[in-house]
Swiss-Prot record:
Protein name: Metal-staphylopine-binding protein CntA
NCBIfam families the UniProt entry points to: nickel_nikA, opine_bind_CntA
Stored InterPro entries: CntA-like, Peptide/Ni-bd, SBP_5, SBP_5_CS, SBP_5_dom
Gene name of this polypeptide: cntA
Subunit annotation: The complex is composed of two ATP-binding proteins (CntD and CntF), two transmembrane proteins (CntB and CntC) and a solute-binding protein (CntA).
Originating species: Staphylococcus aureus (strain Mu50 / ATCC 700699)
Function: Part of the ABC transporter complex CntABCDF (Opp1) involved in the uptake of metal in complex with the metallophore staphylopine (StP). May be involved in the import of a large array of divalent metals ions such as nickel, cobalt, zinc, copper and iron. Binds the metal via the metallophore StP, and transfers the StP-metal complex to the membrane-bound permease.
Alphabetical GO biological process terms: cobalt ion transport; copper ion transport; iron ion transport; nickel cation transport; peptide transport; zinc ion transport
Induction or repression: Up-regulated in metal-poor media.
Lipid-binding residues (covalent, S-diacylglycerol cysteine): 21
Family: Belongs to the bacterial solute-binding protein 5 family.
SUPFAM superfamilies documented for this protein: Periplasmic binding protein-like II (SSF53850)
Subcellular location(s) of the protein: Cell membrane
Length: 532
């Protein structure tokens, strides 16, 4: 085990860590009340699911889509069945007739049309989802039948409609001026929990929906409690003030690996990990014209500086496997190998020399035309593992004569930089099993995705067109081949450097049963969990 933090070491010395002292009462009270209280580094935010200001794990307790994406494919949810026209452009959904919104309003075809129309009024915001650009119109056929018409066939349509947002449903009574793009009055969905008291930057309550149309939650309440990651979150779990923690929708864990082990060792908690959900990666911004990262040869050199085996083993403690390609082979349509560059400092050095960046006699930093080889890297300051990786890469880059300045920022600020292009390198992650490969690939050319990162590619328009064409292919083998061709070109550009295949980690009371995962790293089925 790596060196303990000072606070944890003090607790261990005082005998509090392993005895479980002080934690049982809080845990027992929560069990008696059938309540989970999870620790989170940020407030749940704006719970309007038609924009992107809220916590996805929180929103998924309240709102539901027409269909759900499972390991066995697309399954019914609010729609009990559907038909697809021969040309692949018309989807007819037959809705459940026993669903009510939290405010008592009937869920029907009219509500579906109003919600999808509301999302489409803000479709530029959703451009990373291809379906948002293809929806032509929505027609109500009868009270519980709705028709969705696309401008062209789009094979991933159902998968994108199954996502936790934005195509989920808010009570039309909550709309402002007949739409949701400027906010909603309340947050009434159809899901197994209702939003209760919300104290901004403190806590939020999600109460059991006793009128839920499906299997009702065994828990009476799920509470989100805001606190800093690290020691504060650890002590809160130890005392039983909170009793649940999980990887959030930005890939951030409130607890580091040492804290996870210590909590498990108390005997009060269990730790569960999902299958690989996404790929953690380093994004190198080809569009940053005032920096060396705009040079393809330099980007390729950086790809050879990342020792993913060492990162996975030593920094991630073996909990995540090294990622040798952008998408793992458990992702839909990725049934091929696409190995990326291997760790090779000699090769990296050769490529930097080739790009004209030379080591001088009086400086450890490479120079070209009198300019130092310097880059800025950004990581999520809420993630202890990203910080460790950034520090490790800083040392590796120094060996190669690169001055790497590392900067920790909030996850929201990182997302802003991704959109604006104001970065040289940053840590990020693929969209995940529920979304991929289509969503991450679509994001290669989306303004609020990775357009800035790919904007420096010489033949970018050709690649962008290939992406659009791939999404129209109905045949699975042909679509897979198209994705392979796109990913081969992208990998050659050295923009997305895979590091590890990330999974979702959950810390839960030892006597909590049915702790499971979905296909999404952005949500958890809290309604299925129950105490022994």
């Amino acid at each position: 085990m790596r060196k303990l933090t000072k606070m944890s070491a003090m607790l261990l010395a005082s005998g509090l860590i392993l005895t479980g002292c002080g934690g049982n009462k809080g845990l027992e009270e929560k069990k008696e009340n059938k309540q989970l209280t999870y620790t989170t580094v940020k407030d749940i935010g704006d719970m309007n699911p038609h924009v992107y200001g809220g916590s996805m794990s929180a929103e998924s307790m309240i709102y539901e889509p027409l269909v759900r994406n499972t390991k066995d494919g697309i399954k019914p949810l609010l729609a009990k069945k559907w038909d697809v026209s021969e040309d692949g452009k018309t989807y007819t959904f037959h809705l459940r007739d026993d669903v009510k919104f939290h405010d008592g309003t009937t869920f029907d075809a009219d509500a579906v049309k109003k919600n999808i129309d509301a999302v489409q009024q803000n479709k530029k915001l959703h451009s990373w989802l291809k379906i948002s650009t293809l929806i032509d119109n929505v027609k109500v056929k009868d009270k519980y039948t709705v028709e969705l018409n696309l401008k062209e066939a789009y094979q991933p349509a159902l998968a994108e409609l199954a996502m936790p947002r934005p195509y989920v449903f808010v009570s039309p009574k909550d709309f402002k001026n007949g739409t949701t793009k400027d906010g909603v009055k309340k947050f009434d969905g159809t899901g197994p929990f209702k939003l209760g008291e919300h104290k901004k930057d403190e806590s939020a309550d999600f109460n059991k929906n006793d009128q839920y149309w499906g299997e009702k939650s065994k828990l009476n309440k799920v509470q989100a409690k805001v606190m800093p990651a690290g020691e504060t979150a650890f002590l809160s779990m130890k005392k039983g003030e909170t009793n649940f923690a999980f990887t959030d929708d930005r890939g951030t864990d409130s607890l580091d690996k040492d804290s996870l082990k210590q909590l498990k060792d108390t005997g009060d908690y269990q730790v569960k990990r999902s299958q690989p959900m996404n790929t953690k990666m380093l994004v190198v911004n080809s569009g940053k014209k005032d920096n060396a990262v705009s040079d393809k040869t330099v980007r390729q050199a950086i790809g050879h500086m990342v020792n993913r085996d060492k990162i996975a083993k030593e920094i991630l403690d073996g909990q995540e496997k090294p990622a040798t390609q952008l998408f793992a082979k458990n992702v839909t349509d990725i049934n091929f190998d696409m190995p990326t560059r291997k760790y090779d400092l000699k090769k990296a050095e050769s490529l930097l020399d080739e790009a004209g960046w030379k080591k001088g006699k009086d400086s450890d930093v490479r120079q070209k035309d009198g300019k130092n080889l310097e880059m800025a890297m950004y990581y999520d300051k809420g993630s202890s593992s990203q910080k460790e990786q950034a520090e490790y890469l800083q040392a590796e880059f120094k060996k190669m004569g690169i001055k790497l300045n590392i900067n920790g920022e909030t996850s929201d600020k990182i997302a802003e930089r991704r959109t604006s292009g104001d970065y040289d390198l940053m840590f990020n992650q693929t969209w995940g099993l529920l979304y991929d490969p289509q969503s991450t690939i679509a994001a290669f050319k989306a303004k609020n995705g990775y357009e800035s990162a790919t904007s420096g590619i010489e033949n970018k328009d050709k690649i962008y067109n290939s992406i659009d064409d791939a999404f129209k292919i109905q045949n699975g083998k042909e679509r897979s081949d198209a994705y392979k061709n796109i990913l081969k070109q992208i990998d050659d550009e050295g923009i997305f450097i895979p590091i590890s295949h990330g999974s979702m980690t959950v810390v839960a009371p030892k006597d909590l049963e049915k702790v499971s995962f979905t296909q999404s790293q952005y949500e958890l089925p809290f309604n299925e969990m129950q105490y022994k």
